[in-house]
Amino acid sequence: MLDLTFETPKPKTIAGAKHDWELVIGMEVHAQVASQAKLFSGASTAFGAEPNSNVSFVDAAMPGMLPVINEFCVEQAVRTGLGLKAEINLKSAFDRKNYFYPDLPQGYQISQLYHPIVGEGEVLVEMGDGTARRVRIERIHMEQDAGKSIHDMDPNMSFVDLNRTGVCLMEIVSRPDIRGPEEAAAYIAKLRQILRYLGTCDGNMQNGNLRADVNVSICRPGAYEKYQETQDFSHLGTRCEIKNMNSMRFIQAAIEYEARRQIAIVEAGGEVDQETRLYDPDKNETRSMRSKEEAHDYRYFPDPDLLPLEIEQAWVDDIAASLPELPDDKKARFIKEFGLTDYDASVLTAEVESARYFEEVAQGRNGKLAANWVINELFGRLKKEDHDITDSPVSPSQLGGIIDLIASDAISGKIAKDLFEIVYTEGGDPAEIVEARGMKQVTDTGAIEAALDEIIAANPAQVEKAKVNPKLAGWFVGQVMKATGGKANPGVVNQMVSKKLNG
């Protein structure tokens, strides 16, 4: 387990015209369950299909069609709860959330207001400066996604695509424990990382598979601590909800703007209205969408078409036993097993595919050397070309082969970089490339000494300078490397130069 010896970060303070203010943030994250079928129908969840091609009679709310729950979606919700160290409710139930919208054919959304499948959990959010925020999870419930209204295809008509209707969402609701824009983005990043490790959501924010509703309020310094002591929300300011955020950068910008908007209102003697707002990234501002609804506005009641959902503890235990190693545990193991720094371990475990790649490369090799090549050479090149690790043209075995050649002194570090470039662009077995192209390191001391003697004889003035200033010995090392095409063993060259100049 990760050693949780972190200090709690200080809350972000914003200076108003009259007072200092602090932020209080809670998040409702909608994560699309990674499942091939929808929550209550067998229709496909494939992204990018032709409009209205993945719609069953249940999704379209045809008369007489009844929902049948998808067991795999339930399993994914339980798996997520376990990954967030949350309580699993063996009995949960579905409710109807009633509202009218063109992309909601039923006229209601099936959700879990009163009895969610997952109870309280937590997420530890590291901030990269030795501090970490423990964000409590209040609940996770399953619900149907709505369809999509399209308003920009025709000036006189709007269109509806029901492909997304009925897709299973997990709504992950946090407590108001987040205290700044950077923490909010870090929380989303950590949550997405855990979901990807679990395989319960792909976390693709561009496709809308992970969206956040951000609740923002302000309070004076000290008020939040009173709330923590009493759990009395009256110590906090009126919150506004910013809907459907699908970018960590926009989440930070929206929170910054909304906090300053609320501060300006309060300091001018006004009151913040509890409302739902939208963020406009082009204008970098939030604007009012509607007054904030409460539960009674939706006339929730138990869904009469669905029995309460009861699951067995033994089934939950089986799911728990199948959980993968999660990010914090993997990071701790990488630090201990491979001797990595905290930073390198964080980079390598950021994505499950990156961690898997590194572990294959490092198996049976020097972990620090493997980490250096994966992070600096491979990741650097992939980032430059806007690729991720799944697109890497260099396989773990190929990169491992390059590292083996370095470790055996068959090639120098400089030649290794040239070899990496060849493997990256052309492919091939590293050892065979080195042999075929004559890239092996020169370790023959006789050949190296002959090259050095020639350079010394041709540069007597430089020799005298180097004897006075030992730092100039590097010039001779560079000349020998140049004379041998970079193939001379640098360690041997350094020793020989030192011996010749000081002998």
From Swiss-Prot:
The keyword Nucleotide-binding applies. GO terms for biological process: glutaminyl-tRNAGln biosynthesis via transamidation; translation. GO terms for molecular function: asparaginyl-tRNA synthase (glutamine-hydrolyzing) activity; ATP binding; glutaminyl-tRNA synthase (glutamine-hydrolyzing) activity. The keyword Lipoprotein does not apply. Its EC number is 6.3.5.-. InterPro entries: Asn/Gln-tRNA_amidoTrfase_suB/E, Asn/Gln-tRNA_Trfase_suB/E_cat, Asn/Gln_amidotransferase, Asn/Gln_tRNA_amidoTrase-B-like, GatB, GatB_C_1, GatB_Yqey_C_2, Gln_synth/guanido_kin_cat_dom. It holds the Pfam family GatB_N. Transmembrane segments: none annotated. Keywords: ATP-binding, Ligase, Nucleotide-binding, Protein biosynthesis. It is an enzyme of class 6 (ligase). NCBIfam families: gatB (TIGR00133), PRK05477.1-2 (NF004012), PRK05477.1-4 (NF004014), PRK05477.1-5 (NF004015). Heterotrimer of A, B and C subunits. Allows the formation of correctly charged Asn-tRNA(Asn) or Gln-tRNA(Gln) through the transamidation of misacylated Asp-tRNA(Asn) or Glu-tRNA(Gln) in organisms which lack either or both of asparaginyl-tRNA or glutaminyl-tRNA synthetases. The reaction takes place in the presence of glutamine and ATP through an activated phospho-Asp-tRNA(Asn) or phospho-Glu-tRNA(Gln). Belongs to the GatB/GatE family. GatB subfamily. This is Aspartyl/glutamyl-tRNA(Asn/Gln) amidotransferase subunit B. It comes from Ruegeria pomeroyi (strain ATCC 700808 / DSM 15171 / DSS-3) (Silicibacter pomeroyi). The lineage of its organism: Bacteria, Pseudomonadati, Pseudomonadota, Alphaproteobacteria, Rhodobacterales.
